[in-house]
Amino acid sequence: MATDSGEPASTEDSEKPDGVSFENRAARAVAPLTVEARIKEKYSTFSASGENIERKRFFRKSVEMTEDDKVAESSRRDERKAATNISRVDKVPTNVLRGGQEVKYEQCSKATSESSKDCFKEKTEKEMEEEAEMKAVATSPSGRFLKFDIELGRGAFKTVYKGLDTETWVEVAWCELQDRKLTKAEQQRFKEEAEMLKGLQHPNIVRFYDSWESTLKGKKCIVLVTELMTSGTLKTYLKRFKVMKPKVLRSWCRQILKGLQFLHTRTPPIIHRDLKCDNIFITGPTGSVKIGDLGLATLMRTSFAKSVIGTPEFMAPEMYEEHYDESVDVYAFGMCMLEMATSEYPYSECQNAAQIYRKVTSGIKPASFNKVTDPEVKEIIEGCIRQNKSERLSIKDLLNHAFFAEDTGLRVELAEEDDCSNSSLALRLWVEDPKKLKGKHKDNEAIEFSFNLEADTPEEVAYEMVKSGFFHESDSKAVAKSIRDRVTLIKKIREKKPAGCLEERRDSQCKYVRNVLPQQQTATLQPTPGPHTAAEYEETEVDQHVRQQFLQGKPQQQSSSVRGDTSSEPTAGPVLHSDTSSHPTVAYSSNQTTSSQEQPKLTQSPVLPVVQGQSSVMPIYAAGVGVVSQSQISPLTIQKVSQIKPVSQPIGAEQQATLQNPDFVRSLNQDVTSVKENTNNPDTPSGNGKQDRNKQRRASCPRPEKGTKFQLTVLQVSVSGDNMVECQLETHNNKMVTFKFDVDGDAPEDIADYMVEDNFVLENEKEKFVEELRAIVGQAQEILHVHSAVEKSIGVDSVALESNSNQTGSSEQVLINSASTQTSNESAPQSSPVGRWRFCINQTIKNREAQSPPSLQPSMAMVPGLHPFPSSRNTSNQAISQNTVFTIENNPGHRELFTSKLDHKDVVDGKIGEHASIETEQSSISYQVEDDRQIMTPATDNSNYSAALVCPVPGECEALTSQAGMFMPTYPNQQAAVLADVHIAYPGESVPIGGNAALTSVLVSSDQKPQSLSVQQPTIDAEFISKEGETTVNTETSSPKAVIATQTPGFEPAVILPATILESDGERPPKMEFADNRIKTLDEKLRNLLYQEHSISSICPESQKDTQSIDSPFSSSAEDILSYSMPEVIAISHCGIQDSPAQSPNFQQTGSKILSNVAASQPAHISVFKKDLNVITSVPSELCLHEMSPDASLPGDPEAYPAAVSSDGTIHLQTGGGYFGLSFTCPSLKNPISRKSWTRKLKSWAYRLRQSTSFFKRSKVRQVETEDKRSAIASDPIPLTREFSSDTRALSRCKAMSGSFQRGRFQVITVPQQQPVKMMSFGKDHRPPFNKTTVQSSEQALTFAEAAVSQLIEVEPAMPTHKASVSSRKLRTLYETFKEDKGDPEQGDIVSYSTACETSVSSVATEKNVTSTTEVSVQSGSEPLDKEKNESTPGKQTCTNEFSATLAGNRKSVTKTRPEGDQYLPLREEQAYAQTQNSLFYSPSSPMSSDNESEIEDEDLKVELQRLREKHIQEVVSLQTQQNKELQELYERLRATKDNKAQSSEVPLSPASPRRPRSFKSKLRSRPQSMTHSDNLVVKDALGVESNTVSCQQSPASKKGMFTDDLHKLVDDWTRETVGHFPSKPSLNQLKQSQQKSEAENWNKSCESTPSTMGYTSNWISSLSQIRGAAPTSLPQGLPLPSFHGPLASYGMPHVCQYNAVGAAGYPVQWVGISGPAQQSVVLPTQSGGLFQPGMNLQSFPAPPVQNPASIPPGPK
């Protein structure tokens, strides 16, 4: 159509013989000339004389004119024109010159006489010809267009002449097509297309004016009139200039794409079908590019329908089959771009079309493709010329690609992960290139703002920014465009992932938490650009850039291998983005891997916690998978996480590194990282992955994933001897498939065949899948090799540690076995139909966390037992050296997680790497801090940690407590929190295996040589503190905490389970041996009784995973729970309760408590801290921050706020995550595969509820509320508001970030200040004091906490009514007793509370729903308790204040603002409560969910619950056995109470409903039956669990023999009763009355302890509930609570509490008498007063008589 006048339309033109008419040649020769010049030339060329000359010349057969001759002739003609009377002689010489014939000259001279005649005749002819040329030779039917006899070009089927539009007097191209002999149908079709083409007007489309049929020389032809392009085609340009500059290529390609997009967006879409450089025209003056020859393809194809008419080189394979769509134009564009990039014709190596056809249809790319130098251009071309049209990029994708993006100098990114459901987005706008803006702007500032997808428009927001003075008015369009592009991309992503979004959201949160740790390392990691364009597409350049900058801002977290990880992992790829964790994690991975290898358990724990943010339910496994999921989930999330994460992470990682032999760890990490990078690289080539917020590759960001659609993540590498690798595959259709294979025995090809056969992998992705599998195998082999080497080197030490702590050693072995067992058993359940590789399919693939647990399991790293280096870890932990041990101790959970998780996760997600790095970093930090800490409270710290890790073995516990204490005090809160979280997450899971083994070893070490351990641990702790402190006073929130806390949720069970939880939780096979044989026997009995598949139970993480995988909802739930757990852990860590316990002189007690704490750590600690310290309030917030992002440690970081919200959001998670939580929990329940699977699911529920709570907590409103409360309490460190909305969240984050300020709706953040520096300094400054302060009180607190927990456990069932009161009273009584024994009840209470809470939490973890509830409750309730406690007892308050002050300078605000804390606490707790309730209601794991109820009611569920409770009991026994007389006394006290109220306490124990914790929250919130109740439930449950655990622990402590015997008896009776029947639920009033009575009785005894008790009540109660057994954590809302009569048994957990927690939402009068704040405290269900009124605490609620622990149905749990 539009044809370049000087360029042949096709190759045929150039092939024409010389005999072509002169006119044509001349016309072509002047092609480049302007139209005017051409016209003049035309005249001269076709002048009459010229024609004569030509005629004569041809007539005389003169030699062909040369170019010079032609020019001469032309000039002669001009002269002739000028002088009409030119003698004929003048012409003769010319002729002679031309022809070289003298004869002619002679003849001419002879005819001189006739010259005048000839001249006249010539003149006439010349004029006639000129006139003819000037005349139109043809006219259009309408008369508008004229045709001149000036040929501009000729093609195979067309000839182009010059034309004129008489309406505009603009020259046009008149194109005549040869008669195609069209059928009538084809003619009609062409007419229709021509009419359609007439209306097309676009700056990049050659204008089509008209067309009609005509007759030329007796033949029919079709005439097309189009715009005339004067500067030739792209082909001529390439020929002329050979090389095209990148800038020109980008600009012209963008214009071509815009033209194609215009065509493809018509209705119906217009397909060019013959796009090639010959049909792309250039307009010289403007440099614009236009697509031409529209319609020609149609005409050519219509007549040659069966013969290929087109350009084979540019024809897509499907064009040959006549079945094609718009993608053929994308293919042709790719070939055009290839030609432009190489100046070489595609397939020029082929001799004919047949060869091209063969290559095209076989998918062989042109030889010139390899000549493309620019990788980005090459990537784009590759995405365009794929053989499968469905895999090609779309025009929109290409235009959104960063390469074609028009650089405005601005970058807009998500300030926090997108949950795909909230209409309000938190965005951050960066100025990348101030030079491109007309106004002045600081390039180091980021403007954070909220954007409502429904209400806001980019223009309005840009205008507001201009009004606010951020931008010049002239830049508003650029700002609006940047915002619009980002919002459009977000919308697109949401549309593409409607189903996976929710899960993704959850994952994002989990990832967020997890990333808090990895992010620091991620900072380094993220900068690494990644090849994943697809992964990047989710995250805009800005996002990537921001993340990158943010991460870079936190170099301490550098993870050199992160990028590698990101790149190699396809699934994780999006996680660096895709791996945000992934990439950051990769760096982590290096450190982490080392740590994990050296100290598998501890390393694993840390990783898990990080992952936990993703899914508490699958603490260990979830971490791995969760990481992937998270990465994947949301670039936004990752970005946030990474942002928040960095501060905390460096500390954690550094500490870990320090703890371990840094060099050794580094080498291990590097190895693992390398492996992971390789594995992860495919997934995260771009480093940005989709979720990597870093702006790894702007070009790829916007583009959807071009590469493999699947994502393969390594979850675990089993080093137990079976060489099994557990991988997680996110399929193309959003399914999560977890499978295990033998590194040596299974061939990747076989696995790939199976995957393809089951449609898990597309046929075209098979090759890539095999490659990635091979890379994973190689990495796994490396890991195994390193592991074996490490094991050998550490063997002696490990043995020693194991000897020191039977539990430690056996635990590790158990863990390993567990890993193996889990791999096989859980795998089997999960494996579903997938055959030998045990695939676990999770339909809700987006929720990677759900799959994470299963996958994590195999990777022992996540779960101590599963950890690839579990045994090695055991050995490693011991052999590695105390440094290593310390590292483990410091980050028991973290390290453990890191190790196994790293192995797999790094590979898989790169997140593990991140975690690993963090862990390593933590180690280093710990080492440094260790020295300081050592001085401060070496033994205490060790003890703290130790206890948490290896409570079962007194020595071990002490040692570990000592070491851990060191680690924990400074970072102890975080560490403890992590441990607690781990424990809680999986009371009986393999958590104990990994974390415990390492911790146990450390503990043993500490116990044996308290000083050295103490020293080491203090060093670790000190370093940790140092780093943490540096990171933030709120170290809890800070990196260490973030690291531990974040990781802990997932890893929590691992850490706690190691000693205490292992024993107490029959659900999971205690990986570690119990301190005493009786306990072990009891444990076995419990396992057999409660969990026939006890080992599986122990392996609960995997089982949960399997179950979760099976049940997609559960997977989600697990994920949520994990998130929940994380926040809680963080909160606890922040609170520093763990520190206290660690410090407690009684290491055994501390250990038990710590384990308890670890289990209930987050909820309990939060509760305790909240009670004892305003810090607690701050803690949740910090937890949230961590979970949200590194900013958690840094108040200023906007992401930190989301994290804070998350931690507080634990509840929120439950609320929003209730849905997810249910999802996760349900899989277990639904999965009839095994009860332990159900238990795992329950735990997953709890975790997911926690996480979902966190997640939901982040829900704008609730989160904001929580954040505000926490902010008030914790001031800066706690940006509590998720509820406010993205705005608030973003603002909070911004506020948190130092150097940030708010202007209207916008928050300006100084980029460099994004790191949580404040938090660091805070944590550092105050943490040591806290550690010191809590050292003594820690013991007391732990002891008291246990006693209180036991009471609480008993009371908890009454929590709604009786449970709460009983728990409160018992707790108080315990506290008083403990106080009396200890002498420093206040601090001791705090510590013990946190310990108890932790223990409860671990129980809760077992009961997933309960756990989340409990944790939430504890978090929110803890503060109220803390306040209440302070208020009620001045002395206690003082201690509490001291504790909070020392605990967290970062929480200074909280401590200082105790009243504020009280206020906020109620609010936060209320929020948490509401959220928890919501979570319970909505989440599958939610105790309120009807699904849950049904499943809970199942016999299997009951048995499972019983197992969980028994396991908790065992754990308690183990811990208690190791605890000192104080615990024993407490136990006796509890036992007496139990005897007095055996039934009531037992009943409470069984159900320890999550609602109880929610009740806690409810008090704060005063929400009677809303989702809030659900939230409270979750919290309550966690608390309840803690109480239960503590109670059990205390009992054995007081009377080992008796306790064990009692436990056995209790287990038997409990099993009998529980299994036998479900007692009817007492009415709320009854429960309340009972609780009130109990509380009244206990109030006097433990008035001081009340605040803390209250804080822990929920958690403890939940724990007790679980221990008690029968009642499931999450009971159906409608399920009536059993009426409890009689005194609470020591094991009796306030069943009411549990049910209440569950029933909070269910019962309109959830907490009768409890007003919003009061409701929150599980213990104070009856309270109508403030959150936790000192007077009203537990005592105010009489403990409900507990009929029987057995009487409470476990099903609801």
UniProtKB/Swiss-Prot annotation:
Residues of the active site? 293
Where is the protein found, in the record's own terms? Cytoplasm
Query: Which GO CC annotations does the UniProt entry carry?
Result: adherens junction; bicellular tight junction; cytoplasm
Annotated Basic and acidic residues bias: 66-82
- Entry comment describing in which tissues the protein is expressed: Expressed in pancreatic duct.
PTM annotation: Autophosphorylated at Ser-303 and Ser-307, promoting its activity. Phosphorylation at Thr-540 prevents interaction with KLHL3 and subsequent ubiquitination and degradation by the BCR(KLHL3) complex.
Annotated positions of the Phosphothreonine modification: 540
Q: Which UniProt keywords apply?
A: ATP-binding, Cytoplasm, Kinase, Nucleotide-binding, Phosphoprotein, Serine/threonine-protein kinase, Transferase, Ubl conjugation
Q: Low complexity: which segments have biased composition? A: 1479-1491, 1624-1637
User: Which leading EC class covers this enzyme?
Assistant: transferase
Amino acids binding ATP: 226-229, 276
Q: Give the record's subunit note.
A: Interacts with WNK1 and WNK4.
Kindly provide the name given to this protein in its UniProt entry: Serine/threonine-protein kinase WNK3
